[in-house]
């Protein structure tokens, strides 16, 4: 049986912390779908199409990773994609509480959908897209936390 995992997120923008999780998840599962959420309730810096394109370029070196945008309920999206595992990153205890609620709801909606939680490597454990954007807005150097093409796109957005 092929294990098709889905790693959903807003990825606004995709960071090296996300890539850490993506790379490790790609080595664990037959296929990994990087699902970029439309997130209409969030005020994103990058459009959905831009976030998908940035993620595609960031993950291009991983043969078993595909990238797609979505706006559906996660359980419905997973079912449509024939996904059987959700991958989520955990940085803090607060992340765990929220992710546990989501995992239980997703399991209720799609009983065959498992949630797997990965902790980022220590180097990326404090990174979030929001923090990176905030530091960049104040002219802080965030190049270490982003793939080079994403860093360039962020600088262009902030001009």
From Swiss-Prot:
A GO biological process held by the record: coenzyme A biosynthetic process
Alphabetical list of Gene3D superfamilies matching this protein: HUPs
Catalyzed reactions per annotation: (R)-4'-phosphopantetheine + ATP + H(+) = 3'-dephospho-CoA + diphosphate
Record-level GO cellular component terms: cytoplasm
Annotated metabolic or biological route of this protein: Cofactor biosynthesis; coenzyme A biosynthesis; CoA from (R)-pantothenate: step 4/5
GO terms for MF: ATP binding; pantetheine-phosphate adenylyltransferase activity
Source organism of the structure: Cronobacter sakazakii (strain ATCC BAA-894) (Enterobacter sakazakii)
Intracellular or extracellular location(s): Cytoplasm
InterPro entries named in the record: Cyt_trans-like, PPAT, Rossmann-like_a/b/a_fold
Primary residence: cytoplasm
Residues marked Transition state stabilizer (site): 18
Protein name as catalogued: Phosphopantetheine adenylyltransferase
Record key words, sorted: ATP-binding, Coenzyme A biosynthesis, Cytoplasm, Magnesium, Nucleotide-binding, Nucleotidyltransferase, Transferase
């Amino acid at each position: 049986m092929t294990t098709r995992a889905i790693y959903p997120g807003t990825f606004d923008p995709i960071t090296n912390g996300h890539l850490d999780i993506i790379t490790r998840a790609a080595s664990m599962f037959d296929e990994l779908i990087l699902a970029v959420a439309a997130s209409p309730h969030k005020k994103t810096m990058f459009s959905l199409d831009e976030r998908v394109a940035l993620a595609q370029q960031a993950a291009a070196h991983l043969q078993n990773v595909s990238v797609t945008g979505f706006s559906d309920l996660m359980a419905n999206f997973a079912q449509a994609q024939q996904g059987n595992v959700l991958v989520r990153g955990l940085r803090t205890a607060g992340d765990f509480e929220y992710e546990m609620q989501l995992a239980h709801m997703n399991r209720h909606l799609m009983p065959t959908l498992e949630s797997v939680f990965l902790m980022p490597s220590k180097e990326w454990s404090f990174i979030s897209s929001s923090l990176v954007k905030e530091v960049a807005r104040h002219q802080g150097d965030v190049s270490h936390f982003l793939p080079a093409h994403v860093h360039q796109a962020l600088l262009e957005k902030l001009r």
